[in-house]
């Protein structure tokens, strides 16, 4: 599956660096999350939001070559709006679940 195919399916690309990177210059697009999130936690949150995530391996993020996968999700309004929905869900998930350690 190519990135062009994703546009035809009305999907956007979410790189893990948007959430995992320590600085904005390295790719983080949102406010810092005060805890480390795992890829599985990110994918499960996307499923809960109904964004139908597809993990695509062997795709490298241009700013950080260590990241070798991307996540394609259904587009909701704009990319920035979709990222904010995901960020708010990640922040709310950790706050409402006290069993997970910070």
UniProtKB/Swiss-Prot annotation:
Tell me which InterPro entries the record gives: Signal_recog_particle_SRP19 (IPR002778), SRP19-like_sf (IPR036521), SRP19_arc-type (IPR022938)
Give compartment(s): Cytoplasm
Q: Name one GO cellular component term.
A: signal recognition particle
Molecular function in Gene Ontology:
7S RNA binding
Which Pfam family would be a valid example here?
A: SRP19
Question: What processes in GO biological process is this protein linked to?
Answer: SRP-dependent cotranslational protein targeting to membrane
Q: How does it assemble?
A: Part of the signal recognition particle protein translocation system, which is composed of SRP and FtsY. Archaeal SRP consists of a 7S RNA molecule of 300 nucleotides and two protein subunits: SRP54 and SRP19.
| Entry function | Involved in targeting and insertion of nascent membrane proteins into the cytoplasmic membrane. Binds directly to 7S RNA and mediates binding of the 54 kDa subunit of the SRP.
Family to which the UniProt record says this protein belongs: Belongs to the SRP19 family.
Q: What is this protein called?
A: Signal recognition particle 19 kDa protein
Which species is this UniProt entry from?
Answer: Saccharolobus solfataricus (strain ATCC 35092 / DSM 1617 / JCM 11322 / P2) (Sulfolobus solfataricus)
